[in-house]
Regions:
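Flexible, solvent-exposed loop/hinge segments and secondary-structure transition points
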Residues: 1-110
């Protein structure tokens, strides 16, 4: 479910949804903000049990913020999007992001 988001003046600026995607050690749950034109406005991991120092890096603010501005056409780039020794967790987040963005395109933005 996508919930609309508004600025201080009451103008709709995008949508937010919660995504759960299987990772290495269970579901990785995150909140995704999407702009009206279908780009990522923000990502925040809210729950994960990935390996500390490896997959758990998906909860890092800098890594989460690197998704801002990307859309459903973005292709996973292992050298940019993954961590040494951990590809399952970042790939899971990417998969969840793309799945949610495509759902936005087919359901909300129409």
């Amino acid at each position: 479910e996508f919930v609309p988001g508004y600025d201080a003046n009451g103008n709709k600026v995008g949508y937010v949804t919660t995504v759960a995607q299987p990772g290495y050690a269970g579901d990785i749950t995150f909140i995704l903000g999407v702009t009206l034109d279908g780009k990522i406005a923000g990502v925040r991991v809210t729950n994960q049990a990935e390996t500390p120092g490896l997959g758990a890096k998906v909860a890092g603010i800098e890594w989460q913020d690197h998704w801002i501005g990307k859309d459903s056409s973005y292709e996973f780039n292992k050298s940019v999007d993954a961590f040494a020794g951990a590809t399952i967790s970042p790939t899971a987040v990417y998969t969840g992001l793309i799945r949610a963005l495509k759902a936005y395109e087919t359901g909300v933005s129409k």
